Amino acid sequence: MAKTNISPGMQQYLDIKKDYPDAFLLFRMGDFYELFYDDAVKAAQLLEIGLTSRNKNAENPIPMAGVPHHSAQQYIDVLIELGYKVAVAEQMEDPKQAVGVVKREVVQVITPGTVVDSAKPDSANNFLVAVDFDGCRYGLAYMDVSTGEFCVTDLADFTSVRSEIQNLKAKEVLLGFDLSEEEQTILVKQMNLLLSYEETVYEDKSLIDGQLTTVELTAAGKLLQYVHKTQMRELSHLQALVHYEIKDYLQMSYATKSSLDLVENARTNKKHGSLYWLLDETKTAMGMRLLRSWIDRPLVSKEAILERQEIIQVFLNAFIERTDLSNSLKGVYDIERLSSRVSFGKANPKDLLQLGHTLAQVPYIKAILESFDSPCVDKLVNDIDSLPELEYLIRTAIDPDAPATISEGSIIRTGFDERLDHYRKVMREGTGWIADIEAKERQASGINNLKIDYNKKDGYYFHVTTSNLSLVPEHFFRKATLKNSERYGTAELAKIEGQMLEAREESSSLEYDIFMCIRAQVETYINRLQKLAKILATVDVLQSLAVVAETNHYIRPQFNDNHVITIQEGRHAVVEKVMGVQEYIPNSISFDQQTSIQLITGPNMSGKSTYMRQLALTVIMAQMGSFVAADHVDLPLFDAIFTRIGAADDLISGQSTFMVEMMEANQAIKRASDNSLILFDELGRGTATYDGMALAQAIIEYIHDRVGAKTIFATHYHELTDLSTKLTSLVNVHVATLEKDGDVTFLHKIAEGPADKSYGIHVAKIAGLPKSLLKRADEVLTRLETQSRSTEIMSVPPQVESSSAVRQGQLSLFGDEEKAHEIRQALEAIDVMNMTPLQAMTTLYELKKLL
């Protein structure tokens, strides 16, 4: 279409769209947000809405699609969830008063990392991440725009950057052009992230600590610049920038957290069946977020851990007070996100009522905490700011039955503002005045069915049917004529109507102004509200951990400086919860000062992986301050956990490859210290037997001689158990079994020493493999076991058979029994007497193919 044919309105659209080429532009036109051109075509497909066109009769109609403004949020949510950006252009003036084209401007750009409003609010964090690289180290900053949380750190390598982004579950990452193409490809293709590029850095340093490194400062500034650019307003709810160090927390990669099912079950991608699910007895959205953060980042400071333990113990010892506390927390709304809505100018009357209701609960919560009469709890109590003046303002100003939208009126309480009360009185009494006029004129005119009605066009009027027109008084004046009636007005009615309309307009305008003023006053309290939110969230998580500890009979773990692990009758907390206490079989775990490696053998399904995960979860729960599932626990403080738990167990099915195994093993042996915990399950099984065994042995020796980390190494390579004679810090353990009358029972108990058998064929039997196959497997196993093979682990293995021999061996494994059975069934099904010669030849040919 030639530019000269474009209407002024469409030219305005194109001018705005030019500035937001990577976003869907929602262009407000009356009661709809319209999309045009390619945006319309693509949005119609993604949102499943109708695609029409503007100027349908033109040579080149403009594709157009639209959504109602009152339900636009649900459509925006869909686009954001799919990874797109949305720019919202609003009408900046009343169309009735506009001269020419209505002025429109983009008021916000919504991206996957900057979501504040949602039709389906989620209590989880939504982090936006920025990364900068100075050629040596990486700066990483993250922010949750919906809560104001703002943090920064620096990292040594891209592997750490990738892991941190995964741990944060970020959906959008801001970059400069300093990351390599390979690194950007990993972020986009492997991690499914939206990349946005931001070169400029925010100039206002008021939110940025001067102690930051240059690369951290750049990452944080880049993040601030992007948020201000997309949100287009001052964000008073952004919290002071917090600098953190990865080493201040128990370090775990995303793969480790996934394999341990910390925040979601890796198989189902659901919360159910995770540690988060188990420990979540929180009552507030803020508490839920903080609990997840504690699980993600267990502590390494003994002092901080013991502080949490002490408060949990106090809560455990006072059931009645703790129950009252839990019930009071149920009345606490999401202060962090309510504060952000205030800051964004989006808080509605319901939001302020929720904030007021929360503040009304705070004195009760504070009194309950004081009743525990504990010095450690008092530290929390002393920091609680009840904000009574803000609670009073909201309680006296906002009507408890106020609607969710500002435009509906009836927001401000009667008695809060004299002028507003006057206008409301006029409207209220005006209704009575109109009723009086109606009664007076009905009696004076003799028109028995005379009544006063109202519509927007004619205002208030007397409704007179045609049959009564002769009775209409002289002071009535005609306003409208209908088919069977006429509408009349009077000077008195017009005067009352004018007073009422003026009162309604003034009341609506004044009420809006009062609400805006109250919201502005609330905004001045945001910093105090955020501090209160943190304390209430902490209290919520601690009471949650106390409830879980009492419900599941957990104990308070101890810590030592001797590198000793003592767990008596420990349980895998999540498995126990799913199975039930009566079904679960506990296991003790012991590492003395001299022991660094446990080599565990035993068949699949016997409990090796559960045993390993049990130790990891016990460590994580202990170091986040929680009580743990055992009769007694004494642990060293670990600085990191490294795992490689393979795909044979259903927990992370389909994720294991030999390359991933080796990469994760490499990360462990390079990054682990003697204060780390390493859990390797069946390492080396993804390659040839001797290759796998050789790698497994070499890795064990490396950890033993150079790393010194506490390690559990599960293996099917029985030959590796002889390492205990050569490595002084390695001990063998196995999963006990009971063998009776040819049947094998897995006892799920860990015992000292190596396993004497693998029981792989028994596991195959449980899996339901054909009996003939199992019988053949027994024959092959017997033959292999009788062959003379060296079991000396350091010796060179015998030469591998030729590929043809291997193929023959693979074929002979199954034998001819099943094939013969198949041929026999085919022969028995033949009706020889009724076959034609051609059918007989065809059947013979098919039988021959079975040989």
From Swiss-Prot:
One cellular component (GO) term of this entry: cytosol
Record carries keyword Cytoplasm: no
Family annotation (InterPro entries): DNA_mismatch_repair_MutS (IPR005748), DNA_mismatch_repair_MutS-lik_N (IPR007695), DNA_mismatch_repair_MutS/MSH (IPR017261), DNA_mismatch_repair_MutS_C (IPR000432), DNA_mismatch_repair_MutS_clamp (IPR007861), DNA_mismatch_repair_MutS_core (IPR007696), DNA_mismatch_repair_MutS_N (IPR016151), DNA_mismatch_repair_MutS_sf (IPR036187)
GO biological process, one term: mismatch repair
Keywords of this entry: ATP-binding, DNA damage, DNA repair, DNA-binding, Nucleotide-binding
Binding residues annotated for ATP, in chain numbering: 602-609
GO MF terms held by the record: ATP binding; ATP-dependent DNA damage sensor activity; damaged DNA binding; mismatched DNA binding
Coiled coil: none
Family, similarity comment: Belongs to the DNA mismatch repair MutS family.
PANTHER family: DNA MISMATCH REPAIR PROTEIN MSH1, MITOCHONDRIAL (PTHR11361:SF34), DNA MISMATCH REPAIR PROTEIN MUTS FAMILY MEMBER (PTHR11361)
Function: This protein is involved in the repair of mismatches in DNA. It is possible that it carries out the mismatch recognition step. This protein has a weak ATPase activity.
NCBIfam families (alphabetical): mutS1, PRK05399.1
HAMAP family given in the database record: MutS
Name of this protein: DNA mismatch repair protein MutS
Organism, as annotated: Streptococcus pyogenes serotype M5 (strain Manfredo)
High-level lineage: Bacteria, Bacillati, Bacillota, Bacilli, Lactobacillales
